[in-house]
């Protein structure tokens, strides 16, 4: 019996160290940044067995086999469609402002398209008004409505949007709705799913969370995009989930979520449509390529000099594209750089770029929420403050709710707006979308909004920050160790 137990112990011990060696090898060959690799290695060494389990759940970036196979196939189809889109020369804006030239050249070289013209582009900040405008657009739709959201929470104004969609589907409008399985769990447990499907709306649960699948694909890769497309002509994107801000996470005591959305008319809906079609095909296997734009889309154009690029990220999409775009935008700044983000856990490269911008004379401001829905991210963010403040960066903490907007403004000319947070999850894992907008009028509007955020914020004092309690510094360091994994 003793021999049997010794054999079992020897087998467990050998298996454990083989797993440790295998994971160590996989971490090292990935060529990721050193803090990220060190965090994983320390996790699996310091926390036996649990660390290995965490790695298998969250360490490797991959989709399920079926989705991965579809993702590889659709790019050949998408590339053919993009080649046809290039023949629509009337939609492209070839020239860009000086500050935007580098980032648009990056997008052109990697994505194959010049910036897209827009007929009309508008910034929206009031959630109630956004919902009202959206409902109006839904009722005016003539052909199709396509949506993707991370969170759809039933109740309040979200139900008004649901009713508008159902009414539109009943009058023959082709409606598609794709929602993240984890973010919209309350929606998928509600009667709305069956009601919508009975009315003719195609509802898809993206990246479905299933305990039987946790060993087949990474469970924390999420569909974080927020896109609304109507009639291949109107496009919405930004930070807003489909929730009523008066009801969403009301019990948390952090106040209303403050969001930012863009509403654009014109051929940009087509390029956003190809992203939506890729996501839809990955989930369903069905092709829904958008129609090519026509010249009528740009009649009576109000933003004649505006140029827009759409950048998408996620498994199967261009690697590091959003990260490269953010770095390019920051290094392009000459006078002023304003960053708004709810989560500030930047990569080493982004942190260095932001600090360098301040040190070469650019006025750099970062606006983050004072109140947070994530204790982990809140403390992980604080460890970067000292380095940023030392470089001359101004850090503002927004006091009137949870600032959920994600935006970057460079020299009041180049704007980046979308779903991307400055954290590892947005930069490397999730399905995200960012609009890169080269337009001075739009930039001035965004500047006014960001200034309003600043007026409702408190500035962190460098001297006071350096005198914070010692236990807080220790806690920050602990979460800094975890920051590459957040």
Swiss-Prot record:
InterPro entries: Cardiolipin_synthase, CL_synthase_A, CLS_N, PLD-like_dom, PLipase_D/transphosphatidylase. Keywords: Cell inner membrane, Cell membrane, Lipid biosynthesis, Lipid metabolism, Membrane, Phospholipid biosynthesis, Phospholipid metabolism, Repeat, Transferase, Transmembrane, Transmembrane helix. It is found in: Cell inner membrane. NCBIfam families: bac_cardiolipin (TIGR04265). This is Cardiolipin synthase A. The lineage of its organism: Bacteria, Pseudomonadati, Pseudomonadota, Gammaproteobacteria, Enterobacterales. Gene3D superfamilies: Endonuclease Chain A. Pfam families: PLDc_2, PLDc_N. It comes from the Bacteria. Residues 219-246, 399-426 form the PLD phosphodiesterase domain. It is an enzyme of class 2 (transferase). Its main location: membrane. It is a multi-pass membrane protein. Its EC number is 2.7.8.-.
């Amino acid at each position: 019996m003793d021999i049997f137990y010794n054999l079992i112990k020897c087998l467990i011990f050998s298996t454990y160290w083989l797993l440790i060696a295998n994971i160590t090898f996989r971490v090292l060959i990935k060529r990721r940044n050193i803090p990220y690799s060190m965090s994983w290695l320390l996790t699996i060494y310091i926390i036996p067995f649990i660390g290995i389990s965490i790695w298998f759940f969250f360490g490797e970036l991959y989709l399920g086999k079926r989705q991965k196979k579809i993702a590889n196939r659709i790019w050949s189809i998408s590339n053919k469609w993009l080649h046809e889109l290039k023949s629509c020369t009337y939609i492209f804006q070839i020239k860009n402002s000086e500050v935007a030239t580098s980032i648009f050249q990056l997008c052109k070289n990697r994505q194959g398209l010049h910036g897209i013209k827009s007929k009309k582009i508008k910034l929206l900040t009031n959630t109630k008004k956004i919902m009202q405008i959206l409902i109006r657009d839904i009722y005016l739709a003539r052909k199709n409505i396509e949506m993707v959201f991370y969170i759809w929470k039933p109740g309040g104004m979200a139900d008004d949007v649901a009713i508008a969609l159902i009414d539109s589907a009943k009058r023959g409008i082709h409606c598609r709705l794709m929602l993240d399985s984890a973010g919209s769990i309350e929606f998928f447990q509600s009667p709305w799913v069956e009601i919508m499907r009975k009315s003719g709306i195609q509802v898809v649960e993206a990246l479905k969370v299933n305990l039987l699948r946790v060993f087949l694909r990474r469970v924390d890769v999420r569909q974080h995009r927020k896109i609304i497309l109507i009639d291949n002509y109107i496009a919405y994107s930004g930070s807003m989930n489909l929730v009523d801000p008066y009801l969403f996470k009301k019990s948390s005591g952090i106040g209303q979520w403050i969001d930012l959305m863009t509403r654009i008319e014109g051929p940009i809906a087509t390029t956003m449509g190809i992203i939506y079609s890729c996501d839809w095909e990955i989930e369903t296997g069905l092709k829904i390529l958008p129609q090519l734009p026509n010249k009528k889309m740009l009649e009576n154009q109000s933003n004649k000099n505006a140029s827009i690029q759409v950048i998408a990220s996620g498994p199967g999409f261009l690697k590091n594209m959003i990260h490269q775009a953010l770095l390019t935008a920051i290094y392009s700044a000459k006078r002023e750089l304003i960053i708004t983000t709810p989560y500030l856990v930047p990569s080493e490269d982004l942190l260095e770029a932001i600090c360098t911008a301040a040190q070469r004379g650019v006025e750099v401001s970062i606006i983050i929420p004072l109140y947070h829905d994530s204790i982990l991210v809140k403390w992980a963010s604080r460890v970067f403050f000292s380095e940023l403040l030392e470089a001359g960066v101004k850090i503002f903490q927004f006091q009137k709710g949870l600032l959920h907007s994600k935006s970057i403004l460079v020299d009041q000319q180049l704007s980046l707006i979308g779903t991307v947070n400055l954290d590892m999850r947005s930069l490397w894992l999730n399905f995200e979308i960012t609009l890169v907008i080269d337009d001075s009028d739009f930039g001035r509007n965004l500047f006014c909004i960001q200034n309003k955020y600043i007026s409702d914020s408190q500035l962190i004092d460098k001297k006071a920050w350096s005198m914070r309690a010692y236990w807080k510094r220790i806690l920050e360091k602990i979460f800094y160790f975890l920051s590459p994994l957040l």
